[in-house]
Amino acid sequence: MPTTREQILQALLARLETIPGATAKREAPLPETVPVGGLIVLRDGDPGEPEMLVSPPTYLWQHKAEIEVIVSRGAGDANTALDGLLMAVGQALEADRSLGGLADWLDWGAPKTHDLAIDGAAGLKGAVVPVTIHYASTNPLG
């Protein structure tokens, strides 16, 4: 059975996969082309150092992950497309902040936007959304 951490990351990816038109992946390299509906890449991030309760042994995590949201600058207004996709990400996360009961709480911060220049790629516009996943496990491996 996967660790609590892995189950949570899989559930978070499943939430992102519910966004209509977009393609969601986990730990994928940045592409040369982006699907028409945009690309969402979940980066596993860092679980950090947990707080520990001793009886029974419980590890309290504040796992920092990132969600990269990328659109093509080709057709239409990339800023509007990126904003729309970011809103859809927010709605998908808001719909289930406990990820089916696996996490205590899911919180995210403001996106940091940037233009992407990848060799051989059309112009891309992206944003990184920091996500903090609060959860408990009985094992220090997550």
Predicted regions span which residues?
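Generic preference for hydrophobic
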Residues: 41-42
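Charged, amphipathic alpha-helical segments and their flanking helix caps
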Residues: 1-36, 45-142
